[in-house]
UniProtKB/Swiss-Prot annotation:
Gene behind this protein: PDXK
Binding residue positions for ATP: 113, 150-153, 186-187, 226-228, 233
Keywords: Acetylation, ATP-binding, Charcot-Marie-Tooth disease, Cobalt, Cytoplasm, Disease variant, Kinase, Magnesium, Manganese, Metal-binding, Neurodegeneration, Neuropathy, Nucleotide-binding, Phosphoprotein, Sodium, Transferase, Zinc
A GO CC annotation given for this chain: specific granule lumen
Keyword Cytoplasm: yes
The name this protein goes by in its record: Pyridoxal kinase
Source species of the chain: Homo sapiens
Binding site for pyridoxal: 12, 47
Activity regulation annotation text: Catalytic activity is inhibited competitively by 4-deoxypyridoxine, and is also inhibited by the benzodiazepine receptor ligands 1012S and ethyl-beta-carboline-3-carboxylate. Inhibited by ginkgotoxin, theophylline, lamotrigine, enprofylline, theobromine, and caffeine. Activity is increased in the presence of K(+)or Na(+).
Amino acid sequence: MEEECRVLSIQSHVIRGYVGNRAATFPLQVLGFEIDAVNSVQFSNHTGYAHWKGQVLNSDELQELYEGLRLNNMNKYDYVLTGYTRDKSFLAMVVDIVQELKQQNPRLVYVCDPVLGDKWDGEGSMYVPEDLLPVYKEKVVPLADIITPNQFEAELLSGRKIHSQEEALRVMDMLHSMGPDTVVITSSDLPSPQGSNYLIVLGSQRRRNPAGSVVMERIRMDIRKVDAVFVGTGDLFAAMLLAWTHKHPNNLKVACEKTVSTLHHVLQRTIQCAKAQAGEGVRPSPMQLELRMVQSKRDIEDPEIVVQATVL
């Protein structure tokens, strides 16, 4: 019998669509993980629509929920997964919870998507309050084992700009020195020999071999861009990286290939369905571009590798 692997996922929840916990829970369950989800917000839909309604969980409410788990001795976890957070006190409470869970299980792996902002047309901007950045740098990242920043977030966390692959590798080394053993820059605008229609994923993993010396594995993936705005892809990426690094703990190349290939299959299915719904020459709406997660169940379970990683 396969050993149970339990994940505490603290992320947003939407009634309709797939972001945050909704983008992470189903795929992880399909891959055999037990998911305990704390919904940091409960919204009708993601905020890319014209309207949304809902409630936001505050740090006291998060503490109360965790206290219920603790009192029942249900705070033994193998993984913690966190994503988008807007509130400084909520983030500080997440740090307290992860620290306590690591005391309960020193082998717990904390997977953090440090959602801070992104680049549009080469210009970066933050979409969370700026006072969250020092909390991420000083408390969250040092506690994390796996982080999945985009290029702009990696630049913010390291205080360094990235203009080349060499600079990206140096930034990843800086992020390793802050704590995490695995750093994956999930998208960057570095040049690709395949043309301007590609974005670059870079990964770096620090491991100890049986002799005790440190081994580094670095990978690069050139991924063709899709001409559409999807929401929830970063949440799905972090969840799939959790799953595939668990299943391939000493092979970042395979873990990233399976993660990126899963996203490829989900996005291709989504864009095909969205275009069919929108009709010829009409740009699909946010509702039509919601990730086709359930329809992609087989691809999530056993993704055909369609994007190869290069070992650097």
